[in-house]
Amino acid sequence: MVTFFTKNDGKVSAIAKGAKRPKSKFSGTLEPFQKIAIDYSGRTSLKTLKSSECIEPFKEFCTRKNLYSAFYVNELINCMVKSNEDPIEIFNLYEQCILQLYDDSDTNKVLRNFEFNMMKVLGYEINFQSDYRSGDPLDANSFYTYAPQMGFTISDSGYGGEQLIEIREKKFSKENLELAKQIIKQTLDFYFEELNINSRSFFR
């Protein structure tokens, strides 16, 4: 079974009969990160793959970390996106992210931008604008605690308001990227309890 993410139909799972045979008609076209044109049929959620043609062949990533980051993006898409999601915006975000990962050495920045954008598209956007209790704008001189689904609220200790404002403005220092990663993971773990991202182990 192969899972595709398509621009028009979103996430599609299909059986590629005979794909493992040496002279399979699918040979060389079902590798990760290749842009391909596919034809499939079937009335159920599990389709039958009829043909696949490579449009853009696999390109080597500049580092192993970039490759692992791309696998992480694939797993995130597969876990977060449902079959009935509107695919076009997600497809464009995914394609842009993979293209950046081919050559960009700052994988943390690429991944955090992708995660934030994906959560916004899927309805899980984090509110870095205001305190969810009072409605007041985040204050650079205050501290905040964070609760997924609710947001940030002022506290005696916790995340610094200045850092949160910088993250909102995409001012990604090394420290801000690490904090953004922590907040995103907390959010994803809350909404997707069974989110099992195997490629996370590559970054430990």
Where do the PLM segments sit?
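Short aromatic-glycine-enriched beta-strand elements
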Residues: 1-3
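Non-catalytic alpha-helical scaffolds and adjoining flexible linkers that form interface surfaces
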Residues: 5-204
